[in-house]
Amino acid sequence: MKFLRYFVALTLVAGVCLTGRALYLHAKAELAGVLIHRAWQVTARSGEPHPPWPWADTHPVARMRIPRLGYDEIVLEGATPRTLAFGPARLLSGADFGEPGNLELAGHRNSWFEPLEVVALGDIIELDWYDFHRAELRTRSYLVKDIRVVAPEDVGQLAPTSDDALTLVTCYPFGRSPRSPQRYIVRALPIAPGRST
């Protein structure tokens, strides 16, 4: 009988601990999102990179929207595993915002870039970023021109280009499968100002 009481008590304590940890992780993720959005607002107003928390090794560099999907996320600098846990991020091997070349953004397939599964050719992608050279907030719209699935070693879509392009990359297939043997690539080209789509 004593064993049964200890077992029940231990089970209850374990349940409370596991529930508490789950609530803590959820609250931490929600708070991180709020802090990242605030940091982007400060960056967009001040023109100074502003980390979302004092010990962050990244900072918001852009806001990306896909209007047809209602997608609206803040893009972080440097696509490291730690950064990608908090949002889509710029690959440092690609062009910088507003610079000529292939601007490359990465995100997890089961969170930040999950909506890419339903992106279609002809969709508009809008990017806002602070241009430190011009000291102003800028916006550029892109038109999705190519969607493909490639092997992880096929990095041709991430190669530097002389033409402006926006390349979004995530693992494939979508969903929660532990394996991701391929990459899903969305390539978009800038829309000339004043041009209708």
Say what each PLM segment does.
Residues 2-197:
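Solvent-exposed, non-transmembrane regions of membrane-associated and secreted proteins
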